[in-house]
Amino acid sequence: MSPEIRDIEYEILALSRHITAAVGRSKRDGDRLDESAYTLLNLLEVGGPMSIGDLQRILGLDTSTLNRQTSAVLKNGLAERRGDESGGLARRFHLTRTGRERLEADRQASCAALANTLSEWSAQEREELMRTLRALNAAIEQRYPQPWPRR
């Protein structure tokens, strides 16, 4: 294993830990979505209505975990499940107005925290980070096909 790969792996571990800690802090700071709800609502916003099968292909979660997560967003009124408007048999999850509002509030808080963290970075450095993260995600998705919706 090359030293560069080992260092990259360690930095990804550290980043993952920082994100997990930030999610914990944000939940303690108020009425914030948990990580699974935030992820599901983002997917529905970007990808449009999705079936449980669509979500399973994207997230790679087992059925029981995904059912538990989708049940929670339904119970909290963040999404609703409707019949397929194109006539298919699958029922699809749709964002509700409440879900959109909560998602936007959480996104604003998340982006404000990120902007604060990167406040001393130049626009060029932020752009470089975005391109590098996008390239890393694309490489992962090419190797392990899970069709993550894009804006």
Language-model regions, residue ranges each:
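Charged, amphipathic alpha-helical coiled-coil/dimerization segments
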Residues: S71-R131
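C-terminal regulatory/oligomerization modules of transcriptional regulators
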Residues: M1-P3, A22-V23, Q124-R151
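Charged/polar positions within long, soluble alpha-helices
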Residues: R17-T20, G24, E104, Q108, ...
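Short, locally clustered residues in the helix-turn-helix/winged-helix DNA-binding domain
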Residues: R17, N42-V46, R107, R134
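N-terminal helix-turn-helix DNA-binding core of bacterial DNA-binding proteins
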Residues: A21-T65, T70, K75-N76, R92
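N-terminal leader segment of winged-helix/HTH proteins
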Residues: M1-Y38, R151
